[in-house]
A protein has these predicted regions:
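Conserved catalytic core of the tyrosine transesterase superfamily
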Residues: 1-273
Length: 273
């Protein structure tokens, strides 16, 4: 019989005290549940076996997320010395699967032309604010009216998400036309706040409809596009790091790199020998 976690509720409370996102808390709890359902106990042998299984079936980034959850639980239960080492992630020298500015503009134009106004604004808000999809779902009419939205990231750090004037004014006109004067901007067909999964799924559906590669149409792709466009217009990486909510400017430096398709285009033009 598998050993059950008898401290799961306190562990969840411990996680929530750290101001982690709901997705992170859910992911950590799921990881611990999976481990206890499949391994007898938190022995070094079982921990290494679990890590080996992760390495066989998942990408390094996912492996590290699972290891981070395990290590959190081990620290919580006083077993710090048993924590697992994370695996090294080889950083690519190019950005991958980022929507081009041309496709971003085309996507918006098609949504608007077809009368899919709410989704037109979903794409525009993602591309013009740099919001994470979880942040987008929290934006309210009140935030649109004042032009910004304060967020508290991990560790209680304040980040202000700005809504640019052009987007703000057009969004206000749209919200007025549908008589939405308060509350969340983006709702589902039941009148409830839309989910992150709902956004991701619908974006893929529209991408297919308009002939845009679904590989580049996902919520975070528009955050990447925001960063790329920002640096092309205003080359201040320190400011961008603040706007993106990055803890380290090194994280932001990736946006100084070209996408794989941009690299290919440059090579095709330059290398003629």
């Amino acid at each position: 019989m598998k050993k059950q976690i008898n401290q799961q509720t306190p562990f969840e409370q411990h996680l929530r005290k750290q101001n982690l996102s709901e997705n992170t808390v859910t992911s950590y709890l799921w990881t611990i549940k999976y481990f206890t359902d499949n391994y007898e106990d938190f022995s070094k042998e079982n921990l290494l076996a679990y890590k080996g299984w992760l390495l066989e079936y998942f990408k390094p980034k996912t492996v590290n997320l699972r290891i981070q959850a395990i290590n959190k639980y081990l620290a919580f239960t006083g077993k710090d010395k048993m924590q697992l080492k994370q695996v090294k992630v080889q950083q690519k020298n190019f950005l991958e699967n980022v929507i081009s500015n041309a496709d971003y503009q085309y996507f918006k134009a098609q949504l608007k032309a077809d009368g899919n106004i709410e989704w037109y604004f979903v794409v525009w808000f993602l591309g013009a604010t740099g919001a994470r999809v979880s942040e987008l779902t929290q934006i309210k009419v009140e935030h649109v009216n004042i032009g910004w939205f304060d967020l508290y990231s991990k560790g209680g750090k304040l980040r202000r998400l700005y809504i640019p004037k052009l987007l703000r004014e057009e969004a206000q006109a749209w919200l007025k036309s549908i008589d939405r004067t308060f509350g969340y901007v983006f709702l589902n067909r039941f009148g409830e706040r839309i989910t992150t999964r709902g956004i991701a799924t619908q974006l893929k559906t529209y991408a297919t409809k308009y002939g845009i590669s679904t590989k580049v149409v996902y919520p975070h792709s528009f955050r990447h596009r925001y960063a790329k466009n920002f640096l092309e217009k205003f080359n201040d990486i320190s400011l961008l790091a603040d706007l993106m909510g990055h803890e380290s400017i090194e994280t932001t430096r990736i946006y100084l790199r070209r996408t794989a398709s941009e690299q290919q285009e440059i090579v095709d033009q330059i290398v003629t020998w």
